[in-house]
Amino acid sequence: MTQHDRLLIIDFGSQVTQLIARRLRELNVYCEIHPYQNVTEAFLKGFAPKAVIFSGGPSSVFAEGAPMPPAGVFDLGVPILGICYGQQVMMHCLGGKVERGHGTAEFGRAFVTPTAERLAILDGWFEEGREQVWMSHGDHVSQIAPGFQVFGTSPNAPFAITGDPARHFYAVQFHPEVHHTPKGAKLYENFVRLAGFKGDWTMGAYREEAIARIRAQVGDQKVICGLSGGVDSSVAAVLIHEAIGDQLTCVFVDHGLLRLGEAEQVVKMFRDHYNMPLIHADESDLFLGALEGVSDPEVKRKTIGRLFIDVFQKHAADVGGATFLAQGTLYPDVIESVSFSGGPSVTIKSHHNVGGLPEKMGLKLVEPLRELFKDEVRALGRELGLPESFIGRHPFPGPGLAIRCPGEITREKLEILRRADAVYIDQIRRHGLYDEIWQAFVALLPVRTVGVMGDGRTYDYACALRAVTSVDGMTADYYPFTHDFLGETATRIINEVQGINRVTYDITSKPPGTIEWE
C-alpha cells in the first residue's frame, strides 16, 4: 500500500481544529489530529510527520498546567505552523514573550497589513494591500523569539504573522481555517507546498488501500453491517462488499419511520443493483406499538435506540458465524473519542446507533471510513459508483420521522407527514434548489386548525416547512425562499395531501433553535 506523507495537527483545544484538517484534506494532504497530551517524543518518532501544525485553544500560557507542545517537536527538522494559541505557545517555548490580554483582545474580523519583507507562505496574499482575517485571542505576543521576523500586523496584534524562514517555523495570531479568513486556504496551500507534500491523498487511492486493509483484517470470516440507508453506512457496505463479496450480509431494520418509498429504494439498490445478501427486517409494528402514546422526544429517541439493538441482534443471529460488525464510523467520531478534554467517547450518531453492540454480540469491528470526513465519504461514494441522487441526499436523523412529528405518533400522522414531505422535496428539486440547501423537511405540528375547502369547513393539521443552509450542521440559517415558491408549495401540499389545511415556514436560525424540531 502507498505510504502517504503525514501531517500532524497537535490539538490545544480549539473549537475549529477539525476545520484545519478539512482544509488540508481538500488539498489532498493526509493529516491526523491528536490532543497535545497524547503526543510524546515516542509518538512523534513513530508518526514521523512531514510537517506539524499547532492548533488554537482557550488556554493562556500563563495558566498553571497550560498545554505545551511535546519535547523534541522543534528538533524534528520539519516545517511547523502555529495558529492563535499555537503562535503564543511557540513564542513562549522558543524565547519570545507573551502578554496577558489587557485591552488588546481581538474577537472577530480584523485586517492584517504586510511589512516590507515578504514570505513564501504568503504567496497570493496582500495583492490589494491588506487581508481580512478572523481573530479570537485574549493574550498576545509582545516579543518574537530569536530568528523570527514580522511579516504582518493588525491594530491589536503587532505580530499577527511571524516566521523564521531558515527553520520553516511560521506563526499567525488569526484563524486561517475559518471562512471569515478568505485567503486562509491559500496560506495552508503554501505551507504544504513548502513542506514538500505530494498531494496524493485521493479517494481513488483510499479505495484501493481500504479494500486491501479489509481483506487483511477479515480474511475468510463473515461480516454483518447495520444498513440504515444513510450515506455513511451505505458507502461502508459497498466498499466492504467490493472487498469480500458475499462474506458480508447487511441487516436493514425498517422501523416504520422512514420517508415515502425509502425502504423500497434501499432494498432495490442493495439487493437488486449491488446483489448484496440483505436481510430486510420490517419491524414497523413493533416500533410503532412501543411508541404509542409517547410524546416526550427523549423517550422517543431512547425507545427507538433500545428496540433497534434488540431487533438487530435478533436478525444478525440469523446470519450465523459472523465475527465482525461493520460500522460507518467517521473521523470526527474518532477525534471526539480521544478529545482534547480527555472526556469519554461520544455515542456515534448514526441512523442505526449500534453503540454497545460489538461487546454484547462478541464481535470485532470493521470501520473502513474512520479516517474520513463526511465530504470525503461522499467523494468515496462517487468513486464507488453510488448514484449522485443518493450520495447528495440531505441528512436524515436516526429516529426518522418520529422527531419530525412533535407529540404523539400515529400511523395516520406519519402517512400525512410522508406525503407532505415528498411534495416539498419535489418542489425544491423542480426549482433546482436541492443542492443549495443543507437540509429540508416538513414537520407535522400537533395542532389542528380550521379551514375552508370548497364550500365546506375543514379541521386538519398544520405543518411547518424547514430549510436551512449550513457548512457542518453546527450553525445554520434559514433558506431565503421567494414568496412565490412558498405560496406554490403551500398550495400543492394543501391540494395534494389530505389532512393538512395550513402551511407555515420556520425561519429560526441555529442557534437559538435546532435544525430538527425535536
Swiss-Prot record:
Its EC number is 6.3.5.2. The active site is at C84 (nucleophile), H175, E177. InterPro entries: Class_I_gatase-like, GATASE, GMP_synth_C, GMP_synth_GATase, GMP_synthase, GMPS_ATP_PPase_dom, NAD/GMP_synthase, Rossmann-like_a/b/a_fold. ATP binds at S228, G229, G230, V231, D232, S233, S234. One of its GO terms (cellular component) is cytosol. Keywords: ATP-binding, Glutamine amidotransferase, GMP biosynthesis, Ligase, Nucleotide-binding, Purine biosynthesis. Disulfide bonds: none annotated. Transmembrane segments: none annotated. Residues 201-393 form the GMPS ATP-PPase domain. GO terms for molecular function: ATP binding; GMP synthase activity. It catalyses: XMP + L-glutamine + ATP + H2O = GMP + L-glutamate + AMP + diphosphate + 2 H(+). PANTHER family: GMP SYNTHASE [GLUTAMINE-HYDROLYZING] (PTHR11922:SF2), GMP SYNTHASE-RELATED (PTHR11922). Catalyzes the synthesis of GMP from XMP. Homodimer. This is GMP synthase [glutamine-hydrolyzing]. It comes from Cereibacter sphaeroides (strain KD131 / KCTC 12085) (Rhodobacter sphaeroides).
